[in-house]
Amino acid sequence: MHITNLISLYFGKFAKKEFLSPVQKLINSSYVRLMGLNMSEFKHPRYYKSLNDLFTRELIKKRVIDENKNTIISPTDSLITQCGQIQNDIALQIKGMQYSVEELLTYYCSSNFEKVKDGSFMNFYLSPKDYHRYHAPVDFKLLKLIH
């Protein structure tokens, strides 16, 4: 297991734990300061029951979406770390490791890879300070989500 996966695993366990209110408030405010979170669009850190609640916080009000048809809208507050053409079945570098696009996409459905094998890709990196929710500002019906 890559070190970043191990760190994520243990941090996730810690983040889900709900501590006594004064301790949780200290943890939350420390995390906000340490990571440099901009909380202007969110509730005050003291209102979150766990670090995970803070990590997956909701926006107080909806963001305005640019309606220009030529604008590309990101589904996340993130940094695009890679983009390009899928070549030789390798396009994804996640947490320090390369992944086979075919293996990643066919784990649940074998026909997924054929649809994208000559396509393009983008990797979105969400840092610990980023807003960790996804949005799809388009008119469609989601049939399946694989995480």
Functional labels for PLM-detected ranges:
Residues 1-147:
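Non-catalytic terminal segments and appended small domains
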